[in-house]
A protein has these predicted regions:
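Structured C-terminal cap/extension of enzyme domains
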Residues: 33, 49, 55-170
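Glycine/proline-rich, positively charged
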Residues: 1-53, 57, 63, 67-70
């Protein structure tokens, strides 16, 4: 972090941020070190509100600090079964309705890109009642993290993160 701060002071780097998807508790420990982060990337979707919630725990802290928030995993990393539970358009609108600077959306085909762009065209924020309705819709299957495997498995973890948290790297 000292090197990052030095680079920012020398105007070689403009913004310094972090990306966390495993647990908001890990990110909050990072914030407790006192570094002045400019932004954080975090998963934000209707399922997140029920299980290890970045929306409830980390998002408010970043806003309190005046830092930008970049949403990720609006579609739960592609884990939401097509046409079931929450539609992709609903999940995107949910993430865009939160107090974020941007939302990164993974597109693995031109069809997904077109669908995402169509959802963004004419976007209107959900009101609080609509946001809560989507959280409630997700709640019955969200409590165990089954649609947020980046939180519950090591499938998405790189070797540095695994090593830092005491896991064996194979």
């Amino acid at each position: 972090l000292d090197a990052a701060q030095e680079a920012r002071d020398q105007k070689r780097v403009r913004w310094i941020g972090f990306h966390g998807e495993k647990s908001p508790h890990i990110a909050l420990k990072l914030l407790a070190r006192g570094f002045a982060w400019d932004f954080a990337c975090m998963p934000l979707n209707p399922f997140d509100a029920t299980f290890r919630s970045f929306e409830k725990q980390l998002l408010p802290e970043m806003i309190r600090r005046g830092a930008a928030v970049i949403g990720t995993k609006a579609l739960a990393g592609g884990a939401i079964p097509a046409g079931r539970l929450i539609k992709s358009e609903e999940a995107l609108r949910y993430a865009w309705s939160l107090p974020v600077s941007s939302v990164l959306v993974g597109c693995d085909s031109s069809a997904v890109l077109k669908k995402t762009l169509k959802s963004a065209t004419g976007f209107k924020s959900y009101h609080a009642g609509e946001m809560d309705a989507l959280r409630q819709k997700a709640r019955p299957t969200a409590g165990d993290g089954r649609f947020e495997r980046y939180k519950t498995t090591q499938e998405y973890d790189g070797a540095p993160g695994l090593t830092a948290h005491g896991y064996t790297v194979s």
